Amino acid sequence: MRKYTPKDNVQRQAPFSDRFFVSPSVPRFDISNDEIFSKDYESFTKAFKLKDAYIEHTHLVLNVDKNDIVEIMNFLSNELEYDMLIEMSAIDYLAAKDGYELFYEMLSLSKHKRLRIKCFLNKDDAVESITSIFDSANWSEREMYDMLGVKVLNHPNMKRLIMPDDWYDHPLRKTYPLQGDEAASWYEVDKIFGKEARDVIGPEQRDPAAIDRYDTERFARL
């Protein structure tokens, strides 16, 4: 008898795994290969300690201590002319490292160069807000908290950005179910019609591959 495998979200699963597959890696280059980055690196190391530094995809990548993040952003903006924060977020490494990797993508309009700041944040720690330096960090920091649960200190309006304020858990964590949890399946029914309508409507269908001809009729029964 064949071993049973769960059929939930089958469209998200690879149909087979190649035993000869080798995960692709991005080459890293020495900073001395770029004259502008070499000067930036030299100035940076005089002011801050670095955990790692390299060039990747034409970006200068600097791995720093999360406690220095506000001073580093000030330095990049005022001293090294990286005057635009174009992206920031976090990566969930809770299972492997019990924390998050935060990254801040910077652009220098005068040098036409991009620099990425990376730092590690333990699960129960918090990072300082940089909204006082870059206004564009406001929504990004809120999204980081909303989707991943990253705590940000001294933010002017630290609340959820995308999900409702009373939403349970953080949807972009790797432990969050692809179809959502039980609270998610009943959220809109409870909010709009009340829990007494659960037996009439049924839980929300959250499997994107499911096709049910009755979905369009259920609300009509109210």
Residue ranges and their predicted role:
Residues 1-222:
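Terminal low-complexity/charged segments
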